[in-house]
Amino acid sequence: MEQLANPISEQVREVGEAVAEALPVPKPDELSPSAISSSFEAEALRSEIIRVGRKLWERQYVDGNGGNISCRLGTKYVLCTPTMMSKRDMEPADICLSDIDGNIVAGDRLRTSELLLHLEIYRANPRARAVVHCHPPYATAFSLTGTPPPVGLISEYEIFIGPAALARYETPGTHAFAETVLPFVQNHNTILLANHGVVCWSDTVTHAEWLTEILESYCKTCVIAKQIGKPLTSIPDDKIQEILVLKRKLGFPDARMEPLPAPDAASAPVNRELEKLVRQVVSRLEER
């Protein structure tokens, strides 16, 4: 039997939607550092950073206190991992809140010394919302040779990454080190850091970590293929062009394509706290 609509529930839902539309939605940039640090969005991002940090440690992409992770919170703030702490052991209170200039505005720990690298990426490319830097063995091995991994061999790698850039060596933590990625940030989401490691950017921390996995797996496969002693077979050029068409539709950068357009500011994420609150209110009213 067809279930009859509940007119009271419909009215409550309409009221909830009207409230959500009528209330001013504060953006992260409009909140104080303490308010944004304790916001629902910040809590969710901290959890994601912690989860990805442990994943990097489990995959042996970091050791000791190595590697760092960050993500943007609005346009003025950045959440980042602390210095001198294993990515295995992080808790929510350990994650630092910094402004876009690298000044700590909330949190009890000192920020990672390599945050300057992340900030240069954010300033140079508005599409970058999260950055993961680590030292996966096979990819780092390529950085020691001064040669990026070859291209045109595996379709998945071509779609998500393609040509990986190789930035020159500079002392980690310095402004000179941070600026080494600037020539590549527009057309590369994955950059090898000479004699150091890898940095990847994406729209989320999870996706930036995916790029790290894809790069490391690809570098490992290339090393194994070379050991077989047979010539490597490349994907035909016309098929690479098909991949580039797909890649542009998906919004992945590639040095073989024109730079992607800047993201539309109107497509910024909605305030998740307000949305959650309205849903809770509507749900409770419907239960009465």
Segments and roles (model prediction):
Residues E2-R288:
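Glycine-rich flexible loops
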